[in-house]
Curated annotation (Swiss-Prot):
It comes from Pseudomonas syringae pv. tomato (strain ATCC BAA-871 / DC3000). Belongs to the RbsD / FucU family. RbsD subfamily. It catalyses: beta-D-ribopyranose = beta-D-ribofuranose. The active site is at residue 20. Pathway: Carbohydrate metabolism; D-ribose degradation; D-ribose 5-phosphate from beta-D-ribopyranose: step 1/2. This is D-ribose pyranase. The gene is rbsD. It is found in: Cytoplasm. Keywords: Carbohydrate metabolism, Cytoplasm, Isomerase.
């Protein structure tokens, strides 16, 4: 059995397969998933699992170079934003970029995979760009 926090087989496989510059998205329950993009659906019910719990586990295994958020998130200020900002201050998320929600949906078409959470706070969506450990 694995010793690290991530136990989900599909998610572990995707993170292990990421190359430099690949995009992995963590999204709320309402974010559309484009055809052809792998969906790892973790959502069980409203709020389970929540966005922050999934982000914490993903960051335990993934090297992040940068991240992308929707500008609308800054207006709505869902609870996840405060956690993202603190992780950003700790340099765990690399460079931050803000784009429109529509542009984030367009960016999702290029994602290697999208992780759907049970999060139901609006605009709780994040694109993580894979970095390298060397």
């Amino acid at each position: 059995m694995k010793k690290t926090p991530l136990l989900n087989i599909a998610l572990s496989r995707v993170i292990a397969s990421l190359g430099h510059g690949d995009i992995l998205m963590i999204v709320d329950a309402g974010m559309p998933v484009p055809p052809g993009v792998e969906l790892i659906d973790l959502a069980l019910t409203r709020g389970v699992p929540d966005f922050v719990s999934v982000l914490d586990v993903v960051l335990s295994e993934m090297q992040v170079e940068s991240h992308v958020l929707a500008r609308e998130m800054a207006d709505i200020k869902p609870p996840a934003l405060q956690i993202i900002e603190s992780l950003n201050l700790d340099d765990q998320l690399g460079q931050q970029r803000w784009i429109s929600h529509e542009d984030l949906k367009a960016l999702s078409r290029t994602a290697k995979a999208i992780i759907r959470t049970g999060e139901c706070q609006p605009y709780s969506n994040l694109a993580l760009v894979s970095g390298v450990v060397f």
